[in-house]
Amino acid sequence: MRYTNYFIPTLKETPSDAEVVSHQLMLRAGMIRKLAAGIYNYLPLGLRSIRKVETIVREEMDRAGAIELLMPSVQPAELWQESTRWEQYGKELLRFKDRKDAEFCLGPTHEEVVTDIVRREVKSYRQMPFNLYQIQAKFRDEIRPRFGLMRGREFIMKDAYSFDVDSSASDLSYDKMYQAYRRIFQRCGLKFRAVEADTGSIGGSSSHEFMVLADSGEDAIVSCTQCEYAANVEKAEARPAPAEHAEPRPLEKVETPAKRSVEEVTAFLGIPSSALVKTLLVVADGTPVAALVRGDHDLNEIKLKHLLGCETLEMANEEMVTRVTGAPVGFAGPVGLNIKIVADLAVQGMKNFVTGANAGDLHLKNVTIGRDFTPTQYADIRNVVHGDPCPRCEAGHLELWRGIEVGHVFKLGTKYSEALRATYLDADGKEQIIFMGCYGIGISRTVAACIEQNHDADGIIFPIPIAPFHCIVSAVNTKDAEVMAACESLYLDLRAAGVEVLFDDRDERPGIKFKDADLIGIPLRLVVGSKNLADGKVELKSRRTGEVELLPLAGAVEKVRNIVAEALGR
């Protein structure tokens, strides 16, 4: 492709409303343009990278035995009402009525639709297993769309759904998809982690998220330094702390005037935050519950919600705290509370700790479990922290990372097939419920996450597999006939060798051309100038390393072809 015949509207300045690097660079590189809040046009360069990701996804899904189909974006309300998600999904589900007053939604996901297809067509165990997938634009009406393609309202997604006769067969389908996802993100050239995760609104028994590692990532993840354990911080398990062996000291009430926070109380009393236990009041389905965590730990509301088995969980407001404890916020404690108390495992072995006294400006010292109060139950309800011992092995400890979720695989079990009555007849002629899995990849989000991980001050640094072009040929002086002839020859020969090449044939200063090439992130740059050409040489520069190599003109195409072939695993 010749630059003068292509559409690359680059920007010199960063738009003021672009907050994260990927959004800034995709706008500046002419890859996307905003149409409305959270809705973007994919311009030619951006679409090329998206198509690269789609191709890798299709190849690996096909390799894993999945079958492509395409389902409508518009879905009837009846299906969502059958699964009960019409009420549960909330305002992210864009709902509307047609001219006959029938209700529909714009699909954010397709569990209901694909289950409806299968319940109509599958009758026997002999028709399974199979896996159906599609690549399609989805819509979720995010309350605050931001960060460009990272959190848009419309986005391109690959969603797949497996159908099996039982749980063990479904586990095999799940593992196939898990391995396919690993291959997909490896082929995209990304550094990532597959982590244990919460199933969220999709539901099901278990799931894994695929996280691209990036300092700007919204999600916190942990991994072990010694074994393969990795999890989203919402799901990560904490190993119980060893019990303290100190003798209990007498309970003591101390004045802590206007000292509410952990930092204020511990500084005032001269103790470490690990010697204080926070009493956090939550409301679970309308019922107050006290959650106890160490002062240097944070409550994991998702763990607590699963433990309590509630539909809704929220922090108690000031009025509720005062009504339950008799004290203002900041002075709650477990001693004397007449509600359910859930204590974190790290609290279980503690003695002589500090808590609120359920009275304003007062705390209790030397609180001891068993003597002063007894929790209703102990459970892992905290977020892990950097350096925690690994819950799976004896040797390792947990490291914290930031990540961007680009893929998620779920074991759905019979959640949707039971709700929509998707059944089959087994070998004995008995009716059974179909077991399902679902598997999503954010195609457009993967491109944005790649940029978050791969950039510098000059622009994007695309990995070769998903770069819009593999190589750019830059003519230093377009008025030099020999330079242009050499560029033309390189351009045609690179194309013939299977290299995707952009020929920058613009009549611009070399500095402008080089800046644009760096901004766009094309991995390899061949520079043809009259001085080097007089010696039969051209310059090859790596966008990632910045290394420059002078090559014989005759060997330049072979060199580039080999670099590209190695990166693509050809």
Curated annotation (Swiss-Prot):
Top-level lineage group: Bacteria
Assembly with partners or alone: Homodimer.
A cellular-component GO term for this protein: cytosol
Domains as described in the record: Consists of three domains: the N-terminal catalytic domain, the editing domain and the C-terminal anticodon-binding domain.
GO molecular function, one term: ATP binding
Function: Catalyzes the attachment of proline to tRNA(Pro) in a two-step reaction: proline is first activated by ATP to form Pro-AMP and then transferred to the acceptor end of tRNA(Pro). As ProRS can inadvertently accommodate and process non-cognate amino acids such as alanine and cysteine, to avoid such errors it has two additional distinct editing activities against alanine. One activity is designated as 'pretransfer' editing and involves the tRNA(Pro)-independent hydrolysis of activated Ala-AMP.
Segments for region (Disordered): 238-257
Classification lineage: Bacteria, Pseudomonadati, Thermodesulfobacteriota, Desulfuromonadia, Geobacterales
Matches recorded under Pfam families: HGTP_anticodon, tRNA-synt_2b, tRNA_edit
Protein name in UniProt: Proline--tRNA ligase
Localization per Swiss-Prot or TrEMBL: Cytoplasm
Entry's EC annotation: 6.1.1.15
InterPro entries in the cross-refs: aa-tRNA-synt_IIb (IPR002314), aa-tRNA-synth_II (IPR006195), aa-tRNA-synth_II/BPL/LPL (IPR045864), Anticodon-bd (IPR004154), Anticodon-bd_dom_sf (IPR036621), Pro-tRNA-ligase_IIa (IPR002316), Pro-tRNA-synth_IIa_bac-type (IPR004500), Pro-tRNA-Synthase_IIa_type1 (IPR023717)
Organism, scientific name: Geobacter sulfurreducens (strain ATCC 51573 / DSM 12127 / PCA)
Transmembrane segments: none
Reaction catalyzed: tRNA(Pro) + L-proline + ATP = L-prolyl-tRNA(Pro) + AMP + diphosphate
Family named by the database record: Belongs to the class-II aminoacyl-tRNA synthetase family. ProS type 1 subfamily.
SUPFAM superfamilies tied to this protein: Class II aaRS ABD-related, Class II aaRS and biotin synthetases, YbaK/ProRS associated domain
